[in-house]
């Protein structure tokens, strides 16, 4: 796992959010993302630890989409944001974020 210092620096635009999971007891949230974040990698996983809150709206004010528009964070109070091309903003408040490429062993789904 590689520490993410600035979510905005990752090439998330047009990547697909496949799955978002929460491990409540551990305070962990993971996002499985399809789309080359690095050359040769098709699937990546963002993993937030020390999670204190999560906001996952799914109203799609701009229309349905599973693609990411942009990422931001960490902002104040450890807030990390992913704006979806649907117009929804997913927000995770956490102490840290890390990225793992090809978490399922290369190639995604």
Regions found by a protein language model. Name each.
Residues 1-109:
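Surface-exposed, interaction-prone regions used to assemble/regulate multi-protein complexes
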